[in-house]
Amino acid sequence: MSAVTASATFTGPQYYDQHLGPIQFDPFAAELVRRLPTRPPGDVLEIACGTGLVTKRLRERLDPALRLMATDLSATMLDYAKAQLGQHDGIEWREADALKLPFPDRAFGALVCGFGIMFVPDRQAMLREARRVLVDGGILLLSVWDRVEENPHAMAGAEVIEAMFPGDAEMRFRTPYEMHDPALLRHLLAGANFRDARIETKRIPFEGADPRNIATGQIRGTPRSVLIEKRGVPLDLVIGKVAAALESKGGNPYRGHAQGLLVEAQAG
């Protein structure tokens, strides 16, 4: 089972949302969305909407007259997001593959993807597909993680899991941190006919977080739970080891940070 397949069969979005959302993902969502004008040059498409953290920020920021289309490959994630944001009018939901978007050419004025492109098998193809559905001059906003060494909470989890499953390629969880090179990002953007790329490093502090909450989010709240259970290892055992590693690195309550890159570009 590949990491991509695990993502598609993942069934624990509530752990992701409740344990990682408030301290890690929502602050980055706020930083990403504030870079979008309230009236971009057309409707807005979100790829890999997950549990809806970026979606909520987008709907609150955008002019109410603009259509917001939120998509994800995972029906489970979409169902969770819809349940969380059902009170928000003006959001359309659709299950969609980022490599085969079910929309016509030049259908949107902006496309937003928070921490999703790293998991797409062909990132260049995804960006070309993004360019296809954007109007000329349309806005692209992405967030990706910086190096895993700049994310000590993630490093702690990766080290524990890789030590528990040595030599197991599926259990090497560095993939989310492989797009940290600005030169690579600019190359991919240029190859998909995006211009005027701006890339900013952003650090979000963790203040007084519970190590076990972070560990629970990292294990039960991500597709790695599917891969661990497939190997017959109790999730609580792994969570306990990750929590201990986090406490060793950052104390209890845990103090540290998450670091990512915020990317802006225009469709050429």
Name each model-derived stretch:
Residues 5-6, 13, 51-53, 173, ...:
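Conserved Class I S-adenosyl-L-methionine
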Residues 43-101, 125:
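Class I SAM-dependent methyltransferase SAM/SAH-binding core
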Residues 22-42, 57:
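Conserved alpha-helix/loop element of class I SAM-dependent methyltransferases that forms part
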Residues 99-111:
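A short acidic, Gly/Pro-enriched loop at the edge of an enzyme's catalytic core
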Residues 109-123, 146:
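A short SAM/SAH-binding and catalytic strip from SAM-dependent methyltransferases
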Residues 139-167:
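Conserved class I S-adenosyl-L-methionine
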Residues 124-139:
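A short glycine-rich, Lys/Arg-flanked "PGG" loop and its adjoining helix->strand segment in the class I
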Residues 10-23:
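Class I SAM-dependent methyltransferase Rossmann-like catalytic core
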